[in-house]
A protein has these predicted regions:
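Conserved N-terminal beta-strand and adjoining loop/helix that marks the start
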Residues: 1-21, 40-43
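Anionic group-transfer/hydrolysis microenvironments
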Residues: 18, 27, 130
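Charged phosphate-binding loop/patch that engages nucleotide di/tri-phosphates or the phosphate backbone
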Residues: 130-171
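Unchanged
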Residues: 41-138
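A short gly/proline-enriched turn/hairpin at secondary-structure junctions
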Residues: 35-36
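A conserved beta-turn-beta hairpin within the catalytic core of GNAT-like acetyltransferases
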Residues: 29-32
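Hydrophobic (often cysteine-bearing) scaffold residues that line and stabilize catalytic clefts
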Residues: 6, 47, 140, 144
Length: 171
């Protein structure tokens, strides 16, 4: 076990009108791994501000295009595999402790632009939130299961239908 600290981060589950979750395929990986937007919390920055900043930096989605649905009052933690400790984040962190936010996307797909000044994703898509854990790198699967469980009451029995206004639900 390492004495390194955890990196403070914010994570975002962005759902569309059909209750699907946004995922991006990481630019810096050769793996077929996808993830939701996330990133570091700057010193002195509150987690919600970090989440909306990261969402903008990674997807081009501005804060006026989202509505906050839920924000669990807890942190979610994962450890890097031993072979990655010391190799990522300049060797400063053992993993991440994350605050997660569930946002409803109010915009259109054209409002999403992953070709940002410092791109993180090479492609993106909307998926059923239930598929999230199987699409991420193995060391983040437990965290994604926990995040999904925390947001499930807001996603409804069909994973998302409760969060979608009745008029916008697929027929």
């Amino acid at each position: 076990m390492t004495d390194l600290p955890y990196r403070p981060c914010a994570g975002i589950m962005l759902i569309d009108r059909q209750g699907r979750a946004f995922v991006g395929q990481r630019m810096d990986s050769t793996l077929e791994a996808w993830q939701m937007p996330q990133g570091g919390i700057d010193p002195g920055e509150d987690p919600l501000t970090a989440a909306t900043r990261e969402l903008w930096e990674e997807t081009g989605v501005a804060s006026d295009k989202v509505e906050l649905i839920a924000a669990p009052d807890r942190e979610f933690v994962y450890d890097l595999p031993d072979e990655l400790i010391g190799k990522v984040w300049k060797g400063k962190w053992r993993g991440q402790r994350q605050r997660w936010f569930l946002f409803r996307f109010l915009g259109e797909d054209g409002d999403i632009d992953i070709a940002t000044p410092h791109p993180e994703f090479r492609s993106w898509r909307w998926i059923d939130p239930a598929d999230l854990p199987r699409l991420v790198v193995p060391f983040k699967r437990d965290l994604y299961e926990e995040v999904l469980a925390a947001f499930r009451p807001h996603l409804g029995p069909q994973i998302g239908m409760e969060a979608v206004p009745q008029a916008d639900r697929p027929r």
